[in-house]
Amino acid sequence: FCVQFGCDWTAFFYASIAAAIGFRLRTRLNEIGSNGYANIAVGAFFATIIAWLLGMFSTSALVADMPQWAASMLQTGTPWHPLMACTLFLVPGVPIINFVNDVLDNNIEVGIVRGINTVLIVSAMAFGIVVAISVCGIDNFVKDLSMTPHHPYWVYAIAAAISAMGFATIYNFPPKQLWVLALGGIVAVCTRNFINLG
């Protein structure tokens, strides 16, 4: 998702590393039986911290002093974009869909429970992110970020395919059918960008 927000590929990999570590940490905490909402907050906290550390590393003097080939691979012109994308694995898309579906099917009580669950997930996620931003002393980094599509469509197509297949693996989608989701992601993102550009 980071590329879809306008970052470069180096920042995309930084966001992916942070998200993978946060996801694995949350999964491990779930396996040992700790509170699910606390696990979401901890996963969001560590994913955000790691994304911030990688972004700061990419702009540090340590990277600038490396040989040119290494520095060009590690430096990013968009070090803040991973902070926006590293916790998207926690967004409760399925619970939101289930909430709306239950309410529309007149299963009001179940819908309310699922809606409250969704609010708690989002609150835990936001808590982890806010604590990480406070710990790092990050100012309002979004004031200078452009979210307008500016990459070629083929770049967005690749990023959309990777994103769609990545989310599908979270829900144990059959690997042989991932190409279908990749095509769906490509169509959705490129349509969104076409509409945004006018």
Regions found by a protein language model. Name each.
Residues 1-198:
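Alpha-helical transmembrane segments and their membrane-interface boundaries
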